[in-house]
Amino acid sequence: HGFTPWFETGFYIFTSSRNGDGVDWVGDHIRPRFSIPEKWHWPVGLSISNEIGYQRHAFSPDTWTWEIRPIIDKKLGRWYAAFNPAFDRSFHGSGVSKGFEFSPNFKFSYDFTPKIAGGLEYYGALGPVTGFDPLKDQQQQIFPAIDLNFSPRWEFNFGVGVGATRGTDHLIAKMILGYRFDF
C-alpha cells in the first residue's frame, strides 16, 4: 500500500460470478498513486493514479487498458465526498480507435459509526473525449454502498448497482476487500 505518505501502489485481482458459470478470473490491474501529503493541509485531498491492466476478452473487448484518474475528496465531519474524473484508453481491442474516454465517478457517504459508512456511488462511461456517445449508449450506474473499516489495515466495500441507461448492466453487485501493507 503506502511506500511514503505521498505514494502508494494498489494491485487488483478481478473476478466474476455469473449464475450457472461459477467464479472466473477476469484480469489484473496495478495502480500507482501519488497524493498531496496531508501535512500540507490543503482544503481538499488531491491525488492522481495511473492504472494499467489486463482483462480477458471474454469479459471485455479491450484486453489491455490504461486509466488516468485524478481524485479530489473531502471529509467534513461524518460526511465524505469524492469526485474522480477518469480518462481511459484501450491499448488492445475494439476501443483503440476511440482514444481517451471520459469516465466520471462520484461518491457521497456518511459515517454511521467509526467503522460503518453508507452512501451512494456513481460510475459513468460517457464515451470519447472528442464527442460523447449518445445517452442510450453511455454506461451510467448508481450504487447504494456500504463501507466497513474493520481496522486501519482492512477495508471492505459492497454495493449493488442499478444501470440508468440501455448501454449499462441493469443490475450488478461489487465488492472490494482491501488490505494495506507497510513497506
Give short role names for the model-derived ranges.
Residues 1-183:
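Transmembrane beta-barrel domains of Gram-negative outer membranes and organellar outer membranes
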